[in-house]
């Protein structure tokens, strides 16, 4: 897949970048470039992998010059750099705009100018029917990606995207928070017991990006079908695994910008989506601004579709949630008495 090629990962010191390195550094890939702002994380990654194929570039996706410096000679790009913490983006929405929207414009423009073969942009379920600044900025990121892709027919570059849900045990997510509270002897804090979230492992997220990389055409967005669970079921399954079933739970209400459930495909997208077994492909709307010719061609299929959300997908019970938790290195480390580290 990547034989003798150069891959650039923006925001590459996070969990996604680490997983890609683990999977591909020992293949025939020529080079993997990590582009990010945090020199400490880059140094940690350099020491962890200690591989001459791994190159590091300090920079910010907001700065086109630093992006271009890292982009020279690159064959493929995985664009993972983002501000993703919902409460932080609520209080600093313009920072989300600068990184998630303008930063994406910089990455895509640099890739096109550099004649990169394929770019995959990573998005989130919060981009669908967004109610918070992070989701709005990611929705706009997708729009930027699709708009750019319209002009790439006949060029050497293909730009597509992915959209995924909650990556379990990621930094800032609820599983590491629950564990911290347990270890401190505090009650678990649940925002709303009925709140549901899609549940994906890190390996699922990497598989989704690779599927998009191999199958995507310009403007496509890919979604992986995923199960969901209520926060109450997740908490119960975790307490059961750790033999803390009598531990107290406090219901505290939702945080800034939170939804009761998340949506991976809107009703309108589901009407046009292509079912590919484990995945959905959302094709771009390729109509131009000459809407007059579409006036008499209505789309009745939209009224017959429904969105794909964490309330209407496969729902995990406590047994199913327990089985999924056991797939996580974070949980295996806990059960083995090792220090568990949340993935970035």
Stretches with model-predicted labels:
Residues 55-76:
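Conserved Rossmann-fold cofactor-binding substructure of NAD(P)-dependent oxidoreductases
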Residues 5-27:
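N-terminal Rossmann NAD(P)H-binding glycine-rich loop of SDR-like oxidoreductase domains
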Residues 79, 83-139, 143, 147:
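Conserved Rossmann-fold NAD(P)-dependent oxidoreductase catalytic core, especially the SDR/UDP-sugar
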Residues 56, 96, 119, 159-162:
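Hydrophobic/aromatic anchor residues within beta-strands of the central parallel beta-sheet
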């Amino acid at each position: 897949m990547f034989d003798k090629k150069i891959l650039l990962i923006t925001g590459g010191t996070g969990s996604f970048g680490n997983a890609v390195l683990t999977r591909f550094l020992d293949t025939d890939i020529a080079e993997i470039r990590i582009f990010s702002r945090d020199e400490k994380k880059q140094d940690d990654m350099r020491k962890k992998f200690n591989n001459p194929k791994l190159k590091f570039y300090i920079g910010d996706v907001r700065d086109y010059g630093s992006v271009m410096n890292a982009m020279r000679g690159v064959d493929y790009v995985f664009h993972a750099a983002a501000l993703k913490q919902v409460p932080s983006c609520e209080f600093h929405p313009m920072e989300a705009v600068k990184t998630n929207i303008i930063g994406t414009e910089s990455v895509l423009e640099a890739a096109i100018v550099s004649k990169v073969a394929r770019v995959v942009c990573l998005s989130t379920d919060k981009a669908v029917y967004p109610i918070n600044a992070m989701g709005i900025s990611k929705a706009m990121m997708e729009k930027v990606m699709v708009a750019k892709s319209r002009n790439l027919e006949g060029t050497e570059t293909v730009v597509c995207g992915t959209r995924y849900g909650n990556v379990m045990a990621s930094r800032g997510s609820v599983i590491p928070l629950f564990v911290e509270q347990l270890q401190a002897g505090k009650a678990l804090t649940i925002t709303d017991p009925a709140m549901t979230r899609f549940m994906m492992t890190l390996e699922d997220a990497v598989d989704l990006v690779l599927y998009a990389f191999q199958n995507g055409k310009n403007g496509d967005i890919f979604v992986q079908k995923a199960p969901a669970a209520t926060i109450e079921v997740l908490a119960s399954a975790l307490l059961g695994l750790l033999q803390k079933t009598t531990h107290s739970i406090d219901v505290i209400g939702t945080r800034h910008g939170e939804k009761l459930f998340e949506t991976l495909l809107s009703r309108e997208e589901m009407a046009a989506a292509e079912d590919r077994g484990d995945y959905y492909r959302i094709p771009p709307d390729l109509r131009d601004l000459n809407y007059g010719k579409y006036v008499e061609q209505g789309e009745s299929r939209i009224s017959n579709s429904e969105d794909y959300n964490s309330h209407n997908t496969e729902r995990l019970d406590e047994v199913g949630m327990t089985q999924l938790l056991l797939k996580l290195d974070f949980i295996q480390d806990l059960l083995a008495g090792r220090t568990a580290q949340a993935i970035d």
